[in-house]
């Protein structure tokens, strides 16, 4: 089928926060680089009045409709209206729920936002986020042994965003910059509980990212060495040596997304799952 246009409307209708839909929609849209998705997100849609406004908006800008609505009547309204105006729609969770029901031999609860219940896991995530923010960029090294994971790496290896992503999964994460000539904190070297992981990237990639950082800030950096490929190569050599000396695993983040890096870290220690 030929490409219709260089953009399309993507309607994401949810009875909860919409996070599941946004992730699924973006993952699918990313496979079609020739067309740009114009996202329309409708969270917390739980009654007919709210849904009618959404359906009118879809009618005004037809496109692909993805939804996670557990109320069967509301879901039926979406299906019917989409058929009437001739747009495709998919209930993202239904095939998964049906698979679970078939395998487990029991019906689902059909409860909106069930994944966001304020249970023990929720409070564990909040605790992990607080810990991670308090221990960003080498802060509070004395209690690194309370961490589940400690990330170390030279500048611009995505330590902070990866730490936050892990914290959102309930994993307490600290991160420390590796700077040649600057010793790591004693608190890290004494810690026995956390998984310590080194993050590296190619010198070319780091030079490019650092150049963008320098251009986008008034912050002072250490001269041309910060972006110089040869100097960066020496930083990376030091980081590799440091990790090898302490038997810490290394992950190259050059071609990895934050999510892929986090998955690789979790795979190193199954109990983090």
Curated annotation (Swiss-Prot):
Enzyme Commission designation: 2.7.11.32, 2.7.4.27
UniProt keyword list: Kinase, Nucleotide-binding, Serine/threonine-protein kinase, Transferase
Enzyme class name: transferase
Similarity-based family: Belongs to the pyruvate, phosphate/water dikinase regulatory protein family. PDRP subfamily.
Keyword Ribonucleoprotein attached: no
Transmembrane segments: none
Function: Bifunctional serine/threonine kinase and phosphorylase involved in the regulation of the pyruvate, phosphate dikinase (PPDK) by catalyzing its phosphorylation/dephosphorylation.
Binding site for ADP: 153-160
Keyword check for Nucleotide-binding: yes
Gene Ontology MF terms: ADP binding; ATP binding; phosphotransferase activity, phosphate group as acceptor; protein serine/threonine kinase activity
PANTHER family the record matches: PYRUVATE, PHOSPHATE DIKINASE REGULATORY PROTEIN 1, CHLOROPLASTIC (PTHR31756:SF3)
Annotated organism of origin: Sinorhizobium fredii (strain NBRC 101917 / NGR234)
Enzymatic reactions: N(tele)-phospho-L-histidyl/L-threonyl-[pyruvate, phosphate dikinase] + ADP = N(tele)-phospho-L-histidyl/O-phospho-L-threonyl-[pyruvate, phosphate dikinase] + AMP + H(+); N(tele)-phospho-L-histidyl/O-phospho-L-threonyl-[pyruvate, phosphate dikinase] + phosphate + H(+) = N(tele)-phospho-L-histidyl/L-threonyl-[pyruvate, phosphate dikinase] + diphosphate
Protein name: Putative pyruvate, phosphate dikinase regulatory protein
InterPro entries assigned to the protein according to its UniProt record, in alphabetical order: Kinase-pyrophosphorylase (IPR005177), PPDK_reg (IPR026565)
